[in-house]
Amino acid sequence: MKINYMFSRIDRDKGFNDNQKKYIKEDIKNNMSITFIASLFDEYERNDTQVKEIVNVFKNIDINFKEVHLIDNRVSKEDAYKYIEKTDIVYLMGGSPELEMKSIIEYNLFNILRDRNGITIGTSAGAMNQTDRVI
């Protein structure tokens, strides 16, 4: 089953609103795996901080992940592909849609992301990059 969540942003202080919680808790269960794809592959500190904050938002609604991976320039293209193949959830992070898509294409992840079943979450740029056309 293919499920896409698209957010303009997630409030890292307040977390998910009640409507978001309802659907997220229906689809995302404890001990799933999640793989984040950065929009800015060279911004390591930013990426690490955002992943920790987003994982905490899920923890606040009692969802804990068995594995958390982050794809940016510290990860080889081969490992990035393996993470996507095996993960339950892909999370496309916010930032620059153009740079995120450039990195997705450079890492040869476009087809596997497009064709995979599972849950894909995107905020801002990550939401835009889930669509066929952004104007």
Question: Where are each of the predicted segments found?
Answer:
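N-terminal beta1-alpha1 cap of cysteine-dependent amidohydrolase-like domains
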Residues: 1-89
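Proteins with a high burden of low-complexity, intrinsically disordered sequence enriched in S/T/G/P/A and R
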Residues: 5-9, 19-22, 96, 103, ...
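Glycine-rich nucleotide phosphate-binding loop and flanking beta-alpha elements
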Residues: 12-13, 43, 97-98, 127-129
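Extracytoplasmic mature domains of secreted/periplasmic and thylakoid-lumen proteins
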Residues: 83-84, 92, 96-97, 109
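Structural motif
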Residues: 89-93, 121-122
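Class I SAM-dependent methyltransferase SAM-binding "motif I" and its flanking Rossmann-like core
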Residues: 99-135
